[in-house]
Amino acid sequence: MADEQDAAGEQPVFQIQRVYLKDLSLEQPNSPQILIEQGQPAVDVNLGIEVQPIADGVFEVAVSATVTTKLGERTLFLCEAKQAGIFEIRNIDADQMQPILGIACPGIVYPYLRAVVADIISRAGFPPVHLAEVNFQAMYEAQQQSGAQQLNS
């Protein structure tokens, strides 16, 4: 019986504790004048991932997006959002921990971020910007290669 408890204690644990909106802002610095101008706006999207340990075996993983939309040289709107999740991750091999934090966790949080960004932009009176699907595995692998290249330089 004690052996069963020890074996159960060694089982890998991956649990989502909470997903929440950590930060959100939308600015229209040139309103209302820019709203009557005609033209095709240019949309620029930047994504980021942050990982913070918050307790033993508990991590906060945040995915952020900055959406900048310009009409010519003037900003139509700027949306910044950060969606985060708290994950309990225990009894995982060290070589598997970074991919879980860099691929699996952002993949869970990102759909919430996409919905928030589209919603806030449409509530501001603009057509929603639907963030593209992201291959977090490819992003993680590119980041790993970039880091390895910097170490070799």
From Swiss-Prot:
Record GO terms (molecular function) = unfolded protein binding
Q: What is the lineage of its organism?
A: Bacteria, Pseudomonadati, Pseudomonadota, Betaproteobacteria, Burkholderiales
Query: One Pfam family name from the record?
Result: SecB
The listed locations are: Cytoplasm
Record organism: Leptothrix cholodnii (strain ATCC 51168 / LMG 8142 / SP-6) (Leptothrix discophora (strain SP-6))
What are its GO cellular component terms? cytoplasm
Record protein name field: Protein-export protein SecB
Q: Which NCBIfam families match?
A: PRK05751.1-5, secB
| Job description of the protein | One of the proteins required for the normal export of preproteins out of the cell cytoplasm. It is a molecular chaperone that binds to a subset of precursor proteins, maintaining them in a translocation-competent state. It also specifically binds to its receptor SecA.
